[in-house]
Amino acid sequence: MAEIKKKPGRNHGVRHALTVEQQRAFMNYTANSPVFNHWAPLFTVLLGTGCRIGEIIGIRWEDIDLEKRLININHSVTYYPRRAETTRCEFAVSLPKTEAGIRTVPMMEPVYNAFMEEYEYQKENGFSTVTLDGMEGFIFTNRFGNLHNPQAINRTIKRIRENYNAEEILKAKKEKRDPIIIPHFSCHHLRHTFCTRFCENETNIKVIQAVMGHANIETTMDIYAEVTDMKKTEAIEKLSHNLNIF
C-alpha cells in the first residue's frame, strides 16, 4: 500500500471516528439500558454496515436477503426539516447520486442478529405501514410509526452519551481508574467509524470502496491513510514494549 499518499491541501480527520473502546462502551450501554435498548438494532446496523444514515432510514424488508445475508442499497431517504411555519417537515426518496452508491453490503453476524431481533419484534407488534413515494415496508420507524429523522437520532445519541458518561465517571472513581468517556458525535460519525474499523482490518482499497459506496477512491484512500498514520504510532509503541532493550 506504499502508493497511497495524502494529497496536500486536503482537510484530513475533520470527522473523527470513535475508538474501539468508545464504540464498545456506547453499544454495550445502549443494549443493556432499559430506556435505550430498543435503539440497539438501528445503531448496530449503522455501525456494522457503514451505510449512510439516509440509506438506513430508507431500508425496507425487501431490500435485505436474510438467507444470503445481503443488504441491497438502491435508494436513500432524505429528511427536509421545516423552514417556515407554513412548511411541513418532509421525507423524500432519492436514488444514489452515482453508480457506486448502488451496491450490495454483506451482513456481519451482529447485523444479521439485529435485523432478526427487529423482525421478531415487528412480527409480534406489527410492521410499519408508512408509505413514501410508493415505497413501503420500511424497517426502522419511531414509536409513532413514522420514519426516523437524523435530528431525532442525534438527540438520542446525545442522551445516551450524556447518561453513559455521567454513570461512567462515578463508576471509574469508585473503581479508581480513568473513565472511558464517549465524545460528542452524530449519526454521520458512525459511517466514518465503520470505515475506520474496516481500514484497520482490510488492505484491499477497492473492496473498502465498494462496500462504502465511495464514488471517488480518493475518499477511501484518505481514510485509509489516516488510519495508517494512527497504526504507525501504535506499531512503534508496541515494538518499543516488545524489544525492551533501551
Regions found by a protein language model. Give the residues of each.
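Basic, Lys/Arg- and aromatic-enriched nucleic-acid-binding interface segment
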Residues: 1-53, 57-59, 66-67, 78, ...
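Catalytic-site neighborhood detector that most strongly recognizes the C-terminal catalytic loop/helix
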Residues: 9, 77-79, 193, 212-237
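C-terminal catalytic core of Y-nucleophile DNA break-rejoin enzymes
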Residues: 12-13, 72, 81-82, 93-117, ...
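Gram-positive cell-envelope targeting signals
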Residues: 17, 38, 48, 55-58, ...
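Short, basic (Lys/Arg/His-rich) helix/loop patches that form interaction surfaces
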Residues: 28-39, 105, 121-131, 135-147, ...
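Short, polar N-cap/turn motifs at the start of nucleic acid-interacting alpha helices
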Residues: 63-70, 203-223
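C-terminal secondary-structure termini that scaffold catalytic or DNA-interacting sites
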Residues: 68, 75, 79-102, 109-111, ...
